[in-house]
Amino acid sequence: TLAAPEDRQAFDSMRLGYVETMGTPPLRAAIAGTYTGLAPEDVLAFAGAEEGIFCAMHALLDKDSHAVIVTPNYQSSETLPLSICATTGVALRERENWALDVDELHVALKPYTKLILINFPHNPTGKVIDRATFDAVVTLCRERGIYLFSDEVYRGLERRPELQLPQVAEVYERGLSLNVMSKAYGLP
């Protein structure tokens, strides 16, 4: 055998097979540990961002819904809601260093808006909104009972760690934080 005895023992005792639909309890506990105030029961593990976005959009939206998407955004975060319901894009202001205007978000809302999608640290600009803007988005969603889906896959890669925002799932009861292992953790 090519493996050292301790490696062979570890491999032979490894559990192989299908796992729980929501992710293994140890994995979910480890993920919950990266958040403040979340329990393993608050975590769903997916094979990747695409699957997470797909499931979230189909769980939260229907043909009678409306979603507001801060653009540009990850392609699936723009196209999946559009395949389900009416959407409105709110563009970041390029000439203002990719600023997000919360008043524009408010104007884009409809009585049947169920979801706002954001992406910070932003891909492709790298923009991180300031805490006051972030809090204003959370407040807007909370006041209207709107879900807030936050693509946070580049969290942890901020050039200035003091600008790191809280994870939406930590601060808002209807907040969904999407993260992956391939960016900040460098895993495939």
Question: What role is predicted for each listed range?
Answer:
Residues 99-112, 124-147, 152-187:
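Active-site pre-lysine segment of PLP-dependent enzymes
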Residues 1-48, 55, 104:
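N-terminal small-domain helix-loop-helix segment of the aminotransferase-like
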Residues 59-118, 128-131:
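PLP-dependent aminotransferase-like
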Residues 30-32, 81, 168:
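Structural element of the ATP-grasp superfamily
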Residues 44, 68, 88, 149, ...:
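Structural detector of well-ordered beta-strand residues that form the stable sheet scaffold
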Residues 49-53, 73-77, 185:
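Conserved coil-to-alpha-helix start sites within the AMP-binding
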